[in-house]
Amino acid sequence: MTQDIGDWAPYLSPEKNKDYFNSLLSFLNSRVGFEIYPPRGTWFRAFEYSSFSSTRVVILGQDPYHGEGQAEGLSFSVPRGMSIPPSLRNIYKELDQDDVDFTNPGHGHLENWAKQGVLLLNSVLTVEKNSPASHANQGWEVFTDQVITLLNDNKDNLVFLLWGAYANKKSVLIDSNKHLILSAAHPSPFSAHKGFFGCKHFSKTNSYLKASNQELIDWSLPL
């Protein structure tokens, strides 16, 4: 964990000394000859862009995009210049239908959300090229579950956006008396019509933030 993670460090640095994390690092080192996404220096970008103190919203993904050049260390986000992935296109469609200020920016780079305190967290932080879930069950899930637990225990009035069955399982880590849990189907083309479209999670997030005297999220993205 050499990447700068700012004020997350006191909370997350102890993880480095745990057996599961050492096993994870050994696994990653054993895969050094394979193409791993995102690039090593961006594995912890979600924490770099969204400080612990600023985090107000968590959008949980599963694992990074496995296509070349797509993953950049933020769930659902891709660098400018990359084609917008289908799930993110559907997120944009929902934003466009929701009661928030949003215009499709023509790119999939979500840094603007992250820097407002939207933690764009994948449950697994690495993947191998063209091999989805190739780094599942190696220890990342233990680490990111601990992230959710730390947020749950040390903060109040967070919003957790859990899309799809995988993300919804994480609700057991969250105290719904302290935080708002918004669950829906996954925005992928296979399931978006089963409850993601029309969920209005973005306006519901801001309504909750307003009610708890927090700054609203500007969901619009720079063109």
Per-segment meaning from a language model:
Residues 1-10:
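Short, extreme N-terminal leader segments that mark the start of a protein/domain
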Residues 7, 14-162, 166-169, 174-175, ...:
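A polyanion-binding, active-site-adjacent surface
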Residues 196, 201:
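C-terminal substrate-binding/active-site "lid" region of AdoMet-derived donor-dependent transferases
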